[in-house]
A protein has these predicted regions:
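Transmembrane alpha-helices and immediately adjacent membrane-cytoplasm interface residues
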Residues: 1-7
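Short alpha-helical basic/polar micro-motif
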Residues: 2, 15, 129, 189
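Juxtamembrane membrane-water interface segments immediately C-terminal to a transmembrane helix
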Residues: 7-18
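A residue-level signal for conserved active-site and pocket-lining positions in enzyme catalytic cores
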Residues: 17, 57, 191
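Solvent-exposed, non-transmembrane helices and loops of integral membrane proteins
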Residues: 21-51, 195-232
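Structured inter-helical modules in multipass membrane proteins
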Residues: 27-141
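Alpha-helical transmembrane anchor segments
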Residues: 133-225
Length: 232
């Protein structure tokens, strides 16, 4: 149960990250106006930061120092900077927050939208913190050892509780029960850290791809042109 709770909590944390990134992209696209090429390039970079954030979270949780996956969305200078910092996702949010703050200072975003953007960034940090807590707080070793010993004692004592009339079939019954219990214990151990590369871990690569597609789609949105009242 503890392992599954950790797995499900990790999935909810990533769900929070996905929702927050979608909200950020949506609000940025609709609420931050662009008047020239320079402003568009700045906004485009902010969208790239949104795509890079979940990739950085994935690499951070897997303790993978390679920034090659980030190179498609960040400049070489930015990747070099991330090589020097201990927490790449946090640093990406600093770049993102700097862009948003400049939009607020230039009064391109009203106070309500500014609050929404700031809250979404905070939600990203909370999702990251939840994932870090899961990774850095493994199940106590005493709990793991006790569980193994409990299963072993149960399997040894199980034949004493079965009827002697079962004969040799008792061996198959005990073997089947032992197989099931040990399988459950192994599964619990495997999903204890749901952010790895095992087949039963969370599909972080797929989640990152989904976020990239969503942010790209939102960044390409153009509001429809409605006819003016004079043309009707």
């Amino acid at each position: 149960n503890n392992s599954y709770d950790r797995y499900w909590e990790g999935r909810k944390a990533w769900g929070q990250i996905v929702i927050s990134l979608r909200n950020l992209a949506r609000t940025m696209q609709v609420s931050i106006p662009v008047h020239n090429e320079q402003e568009w390039q700045q906004k485009k970079r902010a969208f790239q930061l949104l795509i890079a954030f979940p990739i950085a979270v994935k690499l951070h949780l897997r303790q993978n120092p390679d920034n090659q996956e980030l190179a498609d969305f960040l400049t070489p200078a930015e990747c070099a900077t991330l090589d020097q910092v201990p927490n790449r996702p946090i640093y990406i949010t600093l770049w993102l927050q700097d862009y948003l703050q400049k939009q607020m200072d230039c009064q391109r975003v009203d106070s309500n939208r500014a609050w929404e953007l700031d809250d979404s960034v905070n939600q990203l940090i909370q999702g990251l913190a939840t994932c870090e807590r899961i990774v850095h707080t493994p199940l106590p070793m005493a709990y793991v050892i006790y569980l193994k010993q409990l299963i072993l004692v149960y399997c040894i004592a199980l034949p004493l509780g079965l009827k002697p009339e079962l004969g040799w079939s008792m061996v198959f019954i005990v073997g089947m029960v032992a197989f099931i219990l040990m399988g459950v214990e192994e599964l619990a151990r495997e999903i204890e850290n749901p952010f790895g590369l095992d087949v039963n871990d969370l599909p972080l690569d797929d989640l990152c791809t989904t976020i990239r597609r969503n942010v790209t789609m939102i960044s390409q949105f153009q509001p429809p042109l409605f006819p003016s009242t004079d043309d009707r």
